[in-house]
Regions:
Chain A
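Conserved ABC ATPase signature
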Residues: 148-152
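Catalytic Walker B motif of ABC-type/P-loop ATPase nucleotide-binding domains
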Residues: 173-176
Length: 259, 398
């Protein structure tokens, strides 16, 4: 279970930029860029929440806050009742995070990459070994487990990144545009993985630009624009807003006119 | 923290480039370069001293004895030249190295107990002026013979002649031991090389550990691991520290080994000087390297983690190299000696201390003061690096 309310985060802006791009974005003020102003959402077990929004809407920043990489200026977030601001280390143990730009250590083998993060999560050697064996079996990775990550194909790398994400048996998953830049086969590996975790009744937050992924996997949707969440509801409710059955129309409608 | 440390080291060991830079370069290349350079320069010097010099001589008939003396020199060979006007051209196209012109009346002047002179033509636009030294040596022999004659004809005793020649003679008694003089020579550039190796060895790993994590997209996941950021910084810092220090220490060790094995092959004074540098001095040089390596590691890590890519990191670090050379090179300037003023200048003091250690004239109070101040600077820099690492603007600059 994850609950996020009223997140806000601003970044200082470079001075020159400030003068040039005067007030093009309503979030700019006095040298600060209000990347996230008011984002709230929640995601229950067995649910996949689709986080949608145009580029630069503040999705990544919001997800970085939830995954404790950034500290918010305002707002609260709880993971299984743990306040992520008060106990970030505890929260991190429960989060599995994957993004489209996530990389691997090229000079380590696939298995070493996964084990490294297991150890960082403080897993005991025996538990780590069993968990690794199980994951490599499940993702069919034994063939290339001892190859250097450098020499793996993109599909193999993606499997490796997934194994790394869930090595510590997280209780929630945060996926930030996990399929961006992937070919169809690699993207499918990721989507199958999301489906399998949904079946395990683990809450998944999926930020994406691909509406067919939303259609296929998500139960509920949160749309973020200009740093604020402007729509929350089920996929059906969103479809309804568009007038017809088309998610694209509905999405564009929400961005232009609000919910 | 040790998990991160072990993993980073493992990763670096698998990288051939780093391995070559940190291990092979200091152990093999440096002694090799300096060994061959030293051998080559002494070889060239000896060659120049013994090589055959061709010369032309005019007015032989005015000073037959002197001309004969030159003719007797084995390594000098006379080349006939038509007239004195051709000297310049002949030297320019290297037919002769030098020319002597003896004026008429040379012998008469000497006969009348007056000073006589001859002209030496040669190209003195060279670093080591060996030609004039060799000509002078021949002239000096001749002078010696003439003095002996004069002694007889003036009817002066040996003591009286000495008085007439040099009423006051300066006796130079050096208080510096042989080691001190050799140390002053070697000690000047030793710290320069050691510190540069220490910095250069850690440079590539630094880029990999900081900017590399960003470029590969692994930093984000690393930050999300339940490891405090302070521990991450410390682990990465320790890796760089290990690499830099290992590299420099390996070089000290390999030079020590080289000196014990081949020290005997060095000539006279050099050998004694080298012998006198004991294990204790080398150990103290190594001790000096510890906080210095820490300073380098902190600065490199801070710059690297700020950079967005390998390229930017390399761009940030190269000016740093230039900047760090300055205080180290300062120690090589004449007149810059270790005193309490220079002992307070970071890096310069380390260089100077190493020089003093090699010379064997270290003031130990100053040694510990420098060690302490360098450690304090290293500590402050590490703390700064840690604070720097916790800044979101540094970690997520995009």
């Amino acid at each position: 279970m994850i609950e996020v309310t009223g997140l806000a985060k601003r970044f200082p802006m470079a001075r020159q930029k400030e003068r040039r791009a005067k007030r093009r974005d309503p979030r700019e003020q006095q040298g600060w860029f209000q990347a996230v102003r008011d984002v709230s959402f929640e995601c229950a077990p067995g649910e996949v929440l689709g986080l949608l929004g145009p580029n630069g809407a503040g999705k990544t920043t919001a997800l970085r806050i939830v995954s404790t990489a950034l500290r918010p200026d305002a707002g609260r977030a709880f993971i299984d009742g743990i306040d992520i601001l008060a106990e970030p280390l505890q929260a991190r143990r429960r989060i599995g995070f994957l993004s489209g730009t996530t990389g691997l250590y090229g000079r380590l083998s696939a298995r070493e990459n996964v084990e490294y993060f297991g150890r960082l999560h403080g897993m005991a050697p025996e538990r780590l070994r069993r968990r690794c064996d199980a994951l490599f079996e499940q993702l069919d990775m034994h063939e290339f487990a001892h190859k250097r990550a450098d020499s793996l194909s993109s599909g193999m790398k993606q499997k490796c990144a997934i194994a790394r994400t869930v090595i510590h048996e997280p209780s929630i998953l945060i996926l930030d545009e996990p399929t961006t830049g992937l070919d169809v086969m690699s993207a499918k590996i990721v989507l199958d993985f999301v489906a399998s975790y949904k079946a395990l009744r683990i809450p998944v937050i999926l930020s994406t630009h691909h509406l067919h992924e939303v259609d296929k996997l998500c139960d509920r949707v949160c749309i973020v624009n200009h740093g604020a969440s402007i729509f929350q509801g089920t996929v059906e409710q969103l479809r309804h807003l568009g007038g017809g059955g088309d998610l694209y129309d509905a999405f564009v409608h929400v961005i232009h006119h609000g919910a | 923290m040790w998990t991160v440390y072990a993993k980073e080291l493992l990763e670096l060991l698998r990288d051939r480039k780093t391995f070559v830079f940190t291990v092979l370069l200091p152990i093999l290349a440096m002694p090799l370069i300096f060994g061959s350079l030293g051998y080559l320069s002494s070889f060239m010097f000896r060659n120049a001293q013994q090589a055959e010099l061709t010369y032309a001589i005019f007015g032989k008939q005015h000073a037959p004895q002197l001309a004969e003396r030159f003719a007797r020199e084995k390594s000098l060979r006379e080349v006939p030249l038509a007239q004195p006007e051709a000297i310049k051209a002949a030297i320019a196209d290297e037919r002769i190295k030098f020319a002597l012109v003896i004026p008429p009346g040379f012998q008469d002047a000497l006969g009348a107990h007056r000073q006589a002179s001859i002209a030496l033509h040669y190209n003195n636009a060279v670093a080591l002026d060996i030609t004039s030294k060799r000509v002078l040596a021949v002239i000096e022999q001749h002078n010696g013979a003439l003095r002996a004659q004069a002694l007889a004809s003036f009817k002066l005793s040996r003591d009286q002649l000495d008085f007439a020649l040099d009423p006051v003679r300066l006796e130079v008694r050096s208080t510096a031991g042989k080691r001190e003089r050799i140390g002053a020579l070697v000690g000047g550039f030793l710290p320069y090389i050691l510190l540069m190796v220490c910095l250069m060895a850690a440079m590539y790993p630094a880029i990999d550990l900081g900017a590399g994590e960003k470029e590969r997209g692994t930093l984000e996941t690393l930050l999300l691991a339940p490891v405090p950021r302070g521990a991450l910084v410390l682990a990465k810092f320790l890796v760089l520290f290990t690499v830099g220090l290992t590299s420099a220490l390996l070089m000290v060790a390999s030079m020590g080994l080289l000196l014990t094995l081949f020290g005997g092959a060095l000539q006279g004074a050099m050998q004694q000087g080298v012998r006198a540098i004991g294990a204790r001095d080398l150990a103290m040089v190594a001790l000096m390297l510890v906080p210095t390596a820490a300073i380098f590691a902190s600065i490199l890590l801070a710059l690297s983690i700020y950079a967005k890519s390998y390229k930017e990191a390399a761009g940030l670090i190269s000016p740093l190299m230039m900047l760090i050379i300055v205080p180290i090179a300062l120690a090589m300037l004449p007149g810059v000696e270790l005193n309490w003023f220079w002992a307070m200048v970071p890096l310069t003091n380390v260089s100077l201390a190493m020089k003093e250690l090699v010379k064997g004239t270290m003031d130990y109070r100053m040694f510990f003061a420098i060690l302490l101040s360098t450690s304090v600077i290293a500590g402050v820099l590490l703390a700064w690096c840690r604070w720097w690492f916790e800044r979101e603007q540094v970690l997520f600059r995009n």
